[in-house]
Amino acid sequence: MVHIFTSILLGLLLLATGTRAQFQFFEQMFGGGQQQQQHDSREQNVPSDSDWYQRTYDNARCSNYLCPGTLACVAVPHHCPCQHPAVEDKFELGDGSAICVSKGGFKFGEAARKVELARKGLL
């Protein structure tokens, strides 16, 4: 009787150990390891809160106008540069403001023409 009980207990112990190892494998493959990867990439990325931007904005020295998108110091708001000048064209509107629009692969001046058509309600 003791021999049967010991055999059953040993069998359950081996089964539990094998099951645990199997679940650890699946956890590592489908989720557990992902948390570690996310943790590593979060250490390399800029935080998603606005504290860094707010500190940089507050510490910027500008006697004229500080552009909120680029933190450039310019004389008037419509002189602010585009955030991504390689892929954006700046278009100054007649009311003293300016917008940056995607070049979108258009030829030179095409973005400005489309903005003007949109302002007239033709696009």
Swiss-Prot record:
Hydrolase listed as a keyword: no
Keywords tagged on the record: Signal
Transmembrane segments: none
GO BP term, pick one: ERAD pathway
Claim: Signal is one of the keywords in the record: yes
Signal peptide from the UniProt entry: 1-21
Entry's family note: Belongs to the LCL2 family.
Role summary: Probable component of the endoplasmic reticulum-associated degradation (ERAD) pathway.
Protein name: Long chronological lifespan protein 2
Organism: Ajellomyces capsulatus (strain G186AR / H82 / ATCC MYA-2454 / RMSCC 2432)
Lineage: Eukaryota, Fungi, Dikarya, Ascomycota, Pezizomycotina
Gene name of this polypeptide: LCL2
